Structures are given as C-alpha cells and as structure tokens.
C-alpha cells in the first residue's frame, strides 16, 4: 500500500514539475516574441511564428507569417514599444493559452499609434519548441 501511495505522489509531483516547465517555456516564448517584434529580429520570429498563424490585430486586420515578416522588413508596421502589464498562461497538453494586457507604441504606414490592448494567444508545442498559432487583440 505504501508503494502505491508513493507511486501516486511521485507521479503527481512529476506532472506538476512538467507543467511548471512548460509554463516557463511559454512565458519565455511570449517575451521573445515581444522582443523580436520591437527589435525586428526576423530569425526569432521565423522560429516562433507557426506556418499557419493567424495574427489578428485590434482593427480587424489579420496577417499571415509571411505578412508579419514582410511588413516588419519594409517598415510598414513598426513596433517601438510593447510593455506587458499582466500575463496569464494556461497549459493543456501541447497547447497553451496566453491572456495578456499590453501597452503598445509604434506606427503603421507612417501613422503613429499608442494602444492599450487585451491579447489572446494560442501557442502549440512543436518539435522546435513553442510556436504561436493564433493571436487576436482588442482595444481596452
């Protein structure tokens, strides 16, 4: 009986440890995404953005992976600052839901913007790590 109890306790502790590791990895990926958008790091973005991403903005505009990279390179969409005010992460198997409140400053087609947003992101765990599959923001 003691060995069965020990086994269950060990499995529980192991599963909590795995969940904490995944949460930490997703948190790092979310921070890396913000950094890559501001610093225009296409190498990091190529790794973090899933091939099938739908990158939705608060004005209804939705970008593909190629759109994000092209608009960043051309200077059409520039992020000068992305500050996280709160982040909540929920892990479910190979998926993570991230809810964030952010303050964003930048410009689109030469027009400056300053927004407070609520952002919902869906991340998927792939062989290469966590990748952003879907993102939608709304103005606060």
Q: Language model features by range: what are they?
A:
Residues 1-5:
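Positively charged n-region of N-terminal signal peptides that target proteins for export
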Residues 14-51:
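Short, low-complexity N-terminal intrinsically disordered segments enriched in polar/charged residues
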Residues 52-63, 73-78:
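A short gly/proline-enriched turn/hairpin at secondary-structure junctions
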Residues 72-111:
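Surface-exposed, charged secondary-structure patches
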